[in-house]
């Protein structure tokens, strides 16, 4: 999104393997210790959660969030945040981080992921 709206930015790496997402300074920006998170240094605002970040950047730039299509955009954004993202995340967790530990979880999230990709 930052590239699309041609906004200058600086990346700060957060090493999840070192649990840097739990440090006090990062939690001031992202209270749930999740990435992504951004700071707009021009106005001192910070945002966490991808949906909130995308809406902020779209409103800031005046792109990708026009009023004529906002209801449709919001529906797909909420579908990604509440269903698609979490379900694909669970699939990834069971199949890539803990394979073979829960046959039920692996089968369930594989089927859900397969359904999501077919519907999209």
Question: Could you say what each language-model-derived stretch is?
Answer:
Residues 1-111, 115:
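GST-like domain detector, emphasizing the conserved glutathione-binding G-site
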Residues 117-120:
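Alpha-helical transmembrane segments in multipass membrane proteins, preferentially the mid-helix core
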């Amino acid at each position: 999104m930052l590239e699309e709206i041609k906004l200058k930015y600086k990346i700060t790496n957060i090493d999840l393997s070192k649990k840097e997402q739990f440090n006090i300074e990062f939690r001031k920006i992202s209270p749930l210790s999740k990435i992504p998170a951004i700071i707009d240094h021009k106005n001192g605002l910070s945002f966490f959660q991808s949906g909130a970040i995308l809406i902020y950047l779209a409103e800031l730039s005046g792109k990708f969030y026009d009023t004529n299509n906002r209801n449709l955009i919001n529906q797909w954004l909420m579908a990604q945040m509440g269903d698609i993202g979490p379900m694909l995340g669970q699939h990834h967790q069971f199949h890539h981080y803990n394979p073979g530990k829960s046959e039920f979880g692996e089968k369930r999230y594989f089927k859900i992921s397969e359904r999501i990709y077919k519907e999209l």
